[in-house]
């Protein structure tokens, strides 16, 4: 009992570190819109290895927050601790230039345990999105000189979830038909800072003064998602699995703090001079971001202890939705971004390990996955063209059993390509490692 309490205290202590870890990420100009760029579900190495397949997946030594029904697969009298780490190496490129960057972070932390034989619960935290970019545009001005326009942003949004999974049919017996349902209560929290700085370098500074437009956004919202999973044995060798998730649409309110001002730089330090906005001294106002109704569907077919093939589809109609500033003053002016329908398709294949084999290599599971995502962002640029930002990727992973197969170590390597070289493309190599530990924590020991 004391060990369980210490583990849960550790989870909550590490929760506070996640937002700060997400604020030193890879330079990504794509993250300047909305609440930033999201890497879900690829921040979870076990999911990334299968191309992002998550909706039909469940295991006794894994926490799958992307379908809360999966918590029902947690065995009685056990506690599951799941943690993942990721390292990214990314290159931004267009037709003429390229830039390399690298970063590492905690992908997620989660625990799951039974409340009764049919009711299981999970607690966890993971980053949802990240804002991390800096770029400079230099242009000439008259009379003589130039102006540097610096775009920069930092921050991120994290998700703390409390999930519940219920065994409706079959319990955790793999020889029986199983039906599970569940839901997550998700608390989104975080802060985002975006700024545009105009740095004038002119022969005559009488007509020019450095200025900055800055907006801090604070996110605190609660959202819900629902899930179901169904597993059906087919004969003695095969098994069909299906999963579905629903995330209801929601208008998320955020608090913005905006400031537009001029400044002077002396001896390397900045000093504010004149405030352009707000004129009345109140820089805070509420804004809103609409989240669409999102549907996830997954199917998997397995030959017991041999192989598994799985497919996922995610549908999010972002088209028509927008980020609404409830202010009479537009801090950054008209955005060139437009939201489009978002579709993500994932396909994965596994060679399953034989848990009874005497050779360790044969007990290992090997995964291969790929995904394609029709992005929700579409840029409308001054050349009159629309650029939709799509993504595709491929990944490979290996799962190595520990402690007689009850716990597992997952190692994943993957590649993704996002955007287009005609505008800007990000090529990323990702390496992930996660540990899923399943321990007997609720058994009363008997002593003679």
Where are each of the predicted segments found?
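N-terminal signal peptide c-region/cleavage motif recognized by signal peptidases
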Residues: 17-19
């Amino acid at each position: 009992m004391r060990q369980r309490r210490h583990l849960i205290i550790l989870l909550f202590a590490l929760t506070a570190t996640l937002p700060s870890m997400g604020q030193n990420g890879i330079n990504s100009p794509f993250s300047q819109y909305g609440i930033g760029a999201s890497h879900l579900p690829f921040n979870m190495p076990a999911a990334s290895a299968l191309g992002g397949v998550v909706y039909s997946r469940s295991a006794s030594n894994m926490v799958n927050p992307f379908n809360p029904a999966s918590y029902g697969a947690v065995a009685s009298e056990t506690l599951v601790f799941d943690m993942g780490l990721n390292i990214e190496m990314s290159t931004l490129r267009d037709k003429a230039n390229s830039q390399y960057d690298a970063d590492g972070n905690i992908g997620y932390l989660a625990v799951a345990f039974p409340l009764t034989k049919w009711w299981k619960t999970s607690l966890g935290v993971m980053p949802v999105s990240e804002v991390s970019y800096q770029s400079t545009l230099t242009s000439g001005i008259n009379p003589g000189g130039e102006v540097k326009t610096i775009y920069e942003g930092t921050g991120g949004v994290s998700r703390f979830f409390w999930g519940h999974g219920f065994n409706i049919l079959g319990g955790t017996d793999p020889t029986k038909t199983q039906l599970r349902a569940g839901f997550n209560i998700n608390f989104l929290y975080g802060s985002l800072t975006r700024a545009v700085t105009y740095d004038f370098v002119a022969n005559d500074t009488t007509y020019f003064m450095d200025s900055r437009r800055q907006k801090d956004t604070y996110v605190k919202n609660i959202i819900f998602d629902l899930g179901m999973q169904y597993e059906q044995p087919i004969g003695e060798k095969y098994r069909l699995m299906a999963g579905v998730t629903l995330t209801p649409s929601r208008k998320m309110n955020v608090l913005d703090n905006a400031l537009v001002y001029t400044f002077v730089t002396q001896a390397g330090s900045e000093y504010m001079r004149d405030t352009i906005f707000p004129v009345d001294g109140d820089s805070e106002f509420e804004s809103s971001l609409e989240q669409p109704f999102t549907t996830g569907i997954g199917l998997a077919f397995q030959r017991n202890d041999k192989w598994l093939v799985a497919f996922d589809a995610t549908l999010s109609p972002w088209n028509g939705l927008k980020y609404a500033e409830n202010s009479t003053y537009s801090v950054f002016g008209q955005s060139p971004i437009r939201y489009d329908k978002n579709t993500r398709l994932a396909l994965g294949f596994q060679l399953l390990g034989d848990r009874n084999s005497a050779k360790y290599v044969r007990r290992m599971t090997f995964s291969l996955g790929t995904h394609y995502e029709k992005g929700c962002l579409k840029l409308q640029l001054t050349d009159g063209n629309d650029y939709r930002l799509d993504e595709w990727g491929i990944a490979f992973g290996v799962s190595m059993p520990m402690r007689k197969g009850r716990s597992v170590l997952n190692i994943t390597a993957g590649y993704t390509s996002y955007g287009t070289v005609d505008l800007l493309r990000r090529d990323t190599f990702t390496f992930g490692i996660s540990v899923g530990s399943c321990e007997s924590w609720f058994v009363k020991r008997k002593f003679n």
